[in-house]
Amino acid sequence: MLDPSIDSLMNKLDSKYTLVTVSARRAREMQIKKDQQIEHTISHKYVGKALEEIDAGLLSFEREDSE
């Protein structure tokens, strides 16, 4: 079983596409800046660490209104 689960992650964001975009951007940021918001993570990969941050409520996403 994956941790965090897709169900718990979907409660944090509005769609799977948003989840992929936010986690990929955060993973890339962690690779470049070598920083993470959670000290002890289960995952050793950047995308997994980003998903754990989303699950912990440390990352969020707000849509801009397009006019």
Curated annotation (Swiss-Prot):
Catalytic function, reaction form: RNA(n) + a ribonucleoside 5'-triphosphate = RNA(n+1) + diphosphate
One annotated GO molecular function: DNA binding
UniProt keyword annotation of Nucleotidyltransferase present: yes
GO cellular component, as recorded: DNA-directed RNA polymerase complex
InterPro entries in the record: DNA-dir_RNA_pol_omega (IPR003716), Pol_omega/Rpo6/RPB6 (IPR006110), RPB6/omega-like_sf (IPR036161)
Gene3D superfamilies, per the entry: 3.90.940.10
Pfam families (UniProt xref): RNA_pol_Rpb6
EC number(s) given by UniProt: 2.7.7.6
Keywords attached to this entry: DNA-directed RNA polymerase, Nucleotidyltransferase, Transcription, Transferase
SUPFAM superfamilies attached to this UniProt entry: RPB6/omega subunit-like
BP GO terms, sorted: DNA-templated transcription
Keyword Cytoplasm applies: no
Homology family: Belongs to the RNA polymerase subunit omega family.
Subunit structure: The RNAP catalytic core consists of 2 alpha, 1 beta, 1 beta' and 1 omega subunit. When a sigma factor is associated with the core the holoenzyme is formed, which can initiate transcription.
Listed PANTHER family: DNA-DIRECTED RNA POLYMERASE SUBUNIT OMEGA (PTHR34476:SF1)
Known function: Promotes RNA polymerase assembly. Latches the N- and C-terminal regions of the beta' subunit thereby facilitating its interaction with the beta and alpha subunits.
NCBIfam families: rpoZ
Protein name per its UniProtKB record: DNA-directed RNA polymerase subunit omega
Gene: rpoZ
